[in-house]
């Protein structure tokens, strides 16, 4: 009898230990206050292409996560030549990653583009950072949050309450570095086995070498062919290029994005002229309602 009771006691004890252990502590969050600045150190710099680099910044501890909801972005701020420079970025690392955050940034160097002889102030500042030097992060920021399973909370402006939009199909129009919020969302959707939302991306660039995060995008497209459709268009395509060429057109949208519907949301991120003339004007022409569009 005593042996039986002891066995039961041990079983109960093991169950309690397991139950307590399974309720793992939530990882501490770095971005606790969207109005505060958090100086984070550069811990790694990796060259991705001739003008693009990945910058890895350390979080306060190896257990910390950044704390950035899907759909949101951060602001980096720094004094450059005596002036405050602030720029928005979307990390390419998942928010579940502990200890660091990764940004992929296209560096706009001086005297390369005659229209912008000074180049990009923030991107060149990032490129000049030495390992261990810090830059200020602020966030989360943004008007859109993805809640999962096709549910988006979208605010018309910063002071407005969010409106819920449920989409079975998400069209995406991205140009250049505007790909980062799209990849963030694509990864979140395809990594959740309970999320059946389908994504359709048209990604516009000048040349094939300018395609950011191509490997990551094509990896997802290959592993989730029914859930993620990928199409590129280039201003200056190479010979034998099998995707699109030129600006995003109404015909291109018609062919590669889902048609207008109540359960369709179209997201846009890229240079302002592209958003206005290649995206918004063509979406209007094709009958996509304004309530079913969002520009980052």
Swiss-Prot record:
Localisation per UniProt entry: Membrane
GO molecular function: cytochrome-b5 reductase activity, acting on NAD(P)H; FAD binding
InterPro entries per record: CBR-like, Cbr1-like_FAD-bd_dom, FAD-bd_FR_type, Flavoprot_Pyr_Nucl_cyt_Rdtase, FNR_nucleotide-bd, OxRdtase_FAD/NAD-bd, Riboflavin_synthase-like_b-brl
GO BP annotation list: sterol biosynthetic process
Record-given protein name: NADH-cytochrome b5 reductase 2
Name of the encoding gene: cyb5r2
Function per UniProt: NADH-cytochrome b5 reductases are involved in desaturation and elongation of fatty acids, cholesterol biosynthesis and drug metabolism.
Enzyme kind, highest EC tier: oxidoreductase
Main location, first listed in the record: membrane
Transmembrane feature ranges: 2-24
Presence of keyword Lipid biosynthesis: yes
Ribosomal protein as UniProt keyword: no
Occurrences of domain FAD-binding FR-type (ranges): 35-147
Gene source species: Xenopus laevis
Keywords, sorted A to Z: FAD, Flavoprotein, Lipid biosynthesis, Lipid metabolism, Membrane, NAD, Oxidoreductase, Steroid biosynthesis, Steroid metabolism, Sterol biosynthesis, Sterol metabolism, Transmembrane, Transmembrane helix
Membrane-topology annotation of the record: Single-pass membrane protein
């Amino acid at each position: 009898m005593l042996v039986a009771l002891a066995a039961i006691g041990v079983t109960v004890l093991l169950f309690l230990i397991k139950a307590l252990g399974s309720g793992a502590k939530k990882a501490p969050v770095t971005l606790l206050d969207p109005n505060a600045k958090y100086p984070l150190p550069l811990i790694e710099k990796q060259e991705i292409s001739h003008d693009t680099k990945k910058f890895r910044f350390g979080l306060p501890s190896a257990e910390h996560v950044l704390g950035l909801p899907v759909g949101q972005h951060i602001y980096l701020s720094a004094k450059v030549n005596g002036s405050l420079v602030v720029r928005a970025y979307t990390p390419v690392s998942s928010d579940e990653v502990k200890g660091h955050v990764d940004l992929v940034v296209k560096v706009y160097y001086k005297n390369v583009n005659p229209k912008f002889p000074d180049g990009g102030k923030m991107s060149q500042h990032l490129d000049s950072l030495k390992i261990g030097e810090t830059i200020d992060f602020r966030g989360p920021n943004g008007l859109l949050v993805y809640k999962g399973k096709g549910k988006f909370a979208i605010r018309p402006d910063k002071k407005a309450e969010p409106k819920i939009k449920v989409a079975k199909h998400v069209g995406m129009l991205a140009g250049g570095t505007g790909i980062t919020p799209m990849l963030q969302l694509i990864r979140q959707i395809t990594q959740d086995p309970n999320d059946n939302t389908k994504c359709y991306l048209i990604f516009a660039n000048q040349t094939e070498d300018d395609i950011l995060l191509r490997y990551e995008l094509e990896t997802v497209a290959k592993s989730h062919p029914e859930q993620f459709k990928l199409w590129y268009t280039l201003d200056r395509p190479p010979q034998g290029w099998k995707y699109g060429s030129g600006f995003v057109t109404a015909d291109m949208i018609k062919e590669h994005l889902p048609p207008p519907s109540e359960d369709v949301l179209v997201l846009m991120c890229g240079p302002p002229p592209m958003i206005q003339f290649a995206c918004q004007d063509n979406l209007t022409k094709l009958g996509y309602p304004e309530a079913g569009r969002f520009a980052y």
